[in-house]
Regions:
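Conserved class I S-adenosyl-L-methionine
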Residues: 1-37
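Conserved acidic residues
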Residues: 40, 61, 104
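Class I SAM-dependent methyltransferase SAM/SAH-binding core
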Residues: 43, 49-95
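A short acidic, Gly/Pro-enriched loop at the edge of an enzyme's catalytic core
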Residues: 97-106
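A short SAM/SAH-binding and catalytic strip from SAM-dependent methyltransferases
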Residues: 105-118
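A short glycine-rich, Lys/Arg-flanked "PGG" loop and its adjoining helix->strand segment in the class I
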Residues: 119-130
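Conserved catalytic/acceptor-binding region of the Class I
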Residues: 131-196
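Conserved Class I S-adenosyl-L-methionine
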Residues: 173, 177-256
Length: 256
C-alpha cells in the first residue's frame, strides 16, 4: 500500500470524525513524563486530519502538523482556520522543514509503519531541540466488544477475511534501531474503551486501511462496502451504543 493511497477527499473527511482517543494518549504521556508546564513548540508528523495535532496542542503553545497528503492538509486548514496556534503544510515525514525555532517535541501517530526509519530519525534529529522528545504512538480497533462474542467472530471470520490487512512494517523499535543521537525510553501498551452507535461504527470502519485498499483496488465500491458493513453488523449492534476496545502503544524516545 502506497503512502499516496491516503490522498483522497473521502478518507480525509472521514478522518475528521474518528474517535479522539488521542486526548487519552496525551494524558498518558503527561503522566509518564511528569510534564509540569506547557512546551513551546511541537511538531505532529503524519497529522492526518489534525486530531493528533489537536492533542499535541494540549501540551504545547504552538503546533505544526505535516502530512504527505494535500487532501489531509486542506482539511486541517479548514478545521483550524483562524487559530494562530496551528500551522500545517504538506511534507513527507522524512522531509520536515527545519524551523526557525526547533521543536521541543515531535509526535508521530500511526505513521511509522510507512516511513524510511533512518531518514525519518535523521530528519527528526535536525528539527528537535537538545533533549527534545520523539513520541511515537498508535492505537487500533480490536476484535473485542464488551459483552459480545458475536462481534469477535464477525471480526475474525468475516471482516478480516473480506478485508485482509495490507502489508506494512509492524516492527517494534528497539535501541538498536535508533540512530546514535536518540535514546529509547519507556515503551508501554494499553487498552482504551470507546462507545459507538451503529452508524458511527460503520463510518469508522469505512476508513480502515484494509477497507481503503479494497475500494481503491476497484474490487468493491464504497457503497457496496457500506452496505456489507450494515448487513453483517446489524445483529451485533442491537439497542444502545456498544463499547469497543482499542489497543495502543506509546514509545518515548529522547534526543541525547
Amino acid at each position: 500500500m502506497k503512502n499516496t493511497d491516503f490522498d483522497s477527499k473521502r478518507i480525509a473527511r472521514g478522518y475528521v470524525n474518528r474517535p479522539w482517543l488521542h486526548k487519552q494518549v496525551m494524558e498518558q504521556y503527561i503522566k509518564d513524563n511528569t510534564l509540569s508546564k506547557k512546551l513551546s513548540h511541537g511538531l505532529d508528523v503524519g497529522c492526518g486530519a489534525g486530531l493528533s495535532t489537536k492533542a499535541l496542542r494540549l501540551i504545547c503553545d504552538d503546533v505544526t502538523g505535516t502530512d504527505i497528503s494535500p487532501a489531509m492538509i486542506e482539511v486541517c486548514k479548514e478545521q483550524y482556520h483562524g487559530n494562530s496556534s496551528y500551522d500545517f503544510y504538506v511534507a513527507k515525514a522524512e522531509e520536515t522543514v527545519i524551523p526557525k525555532e526547533k521543536y521541543d517535541i515531535v509526535t508521530a501517530a500511526g505513521m511509522v509503519n510507512w516511513v524510511d526509519r533512518d531518514l525519518f530519525l535523521r530528519n527528526v534529529s535536525h528539527v528537535l531541540t537538545e533533549k527534545g522528545v520523539l513520541f511515537i504512538y498508535d492505537f487500533w480497533i480490536t476484535d473485542q466488544m464488551q459483552g459480545s462474542e458475536k462481534y469477535t467472530d464477525w471480526y475474525q471470520n468475516e471482516y478480516l477475511k473480506k478485508f485482509p490487512k495490507p502489508p506494512r512494517n509492524e516492527d517494534i523499535w528497539t535501541q538498536e534501531d535508533l540512530t546514535e543521537d536518540f535514546r529509547m525510553g519507556k515503551q508501554i501498551v494499553y487498552d482504551m474503551p470507546y462507545k459507538f452507535i451503529f452508524e458511527d461504527f460503520v463510518e469508522f470502519m469505512m476508513i480502515q486501511s484494509n477497507v481503503n485498499a479494497k475500494i481503491e483496488s476497484g474490487s468493491m465500491t464504497e457503497s457496496e462496502v457500506r452496505e456489507w458493513m450494515k448487513k453483517s453488523l446489524q445483529d451485533i449492534f442491537v439497542g444502545e451504543a456498544k463499547t469497543l476496545i482499542f489497543s495502543g502503544y506509546n514509545w518515548y524516545i529522547y534526543k541525547r
